[in-house]
């Protein structure tokens, strides 16, 4: 596969070659998870992928508990279907434990982890803010490192956030509650990792084992890939090295049109990927920022071509786009049109909408 063919294959699976008429929960299931450190980005990501998507669609899904927001892949907050969270969260626990120990180091060795998690598990049968849980843990484990204890709980227990009536369905600092309480059943014990790998390839493939490990946060997936046998195929990548894929997965022609699309910060199709299928090597410093931030991007012809941000007053909404190079007139016109549509989605109360492009 050429790099351009690889680009189109991934965009097709990500619903970025055309907005799809797909039920919201099915779309989130298709993507496996949308990174969601902040409440707003998943809304923009879904708006760019689905026809006629509204804020109310996602707000309804989280309030009816068919979609949840909780700590999962790579120890980060993701939006997932409730079914997928229950199915896969247990499989991710080894990577969360490793991440916790790596970050805390010797601080973790001073803690009685089983006792700490047992206390927190009982506490989170009801919704609580993490500031409150630290106080609670200090009352039970006098002299303990409250920050370290809070991090152990965040990584060690399957918790989800409680939605609210806020504009983006969650407040900036949401309460957490046990997934078992919120969903009425505990997360499943992890069996084989094969189903997770198959779902990853369906959403993000073709890919290498290292790609899957980087996205899930898991290690040593070579045996899992090997065990899937003829449920996988290999295709030669741009550098000649094999990539794994599903036999029937879409691999469109390289000349398939790719419309302008706006992706939010930390969009899951961008994070953890080292190849150049969407972000050219020369542009990576503009995309992958200090503090583990990933910029909000404009895709032009399927590739990262600009960053963007929105500012607003009570009357005016402004979209500021910083392009990586000067665009032809037709491309600029398409970016401006899509950008204004984005503004009207994220700032519907504004009276005027202004899209600015700088290079």
Question: What is each PLM-predicted segment?
Answer:
Residues 1-270, 274-276, 282-359:
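Long, low-complexity intrinsically disordered regions
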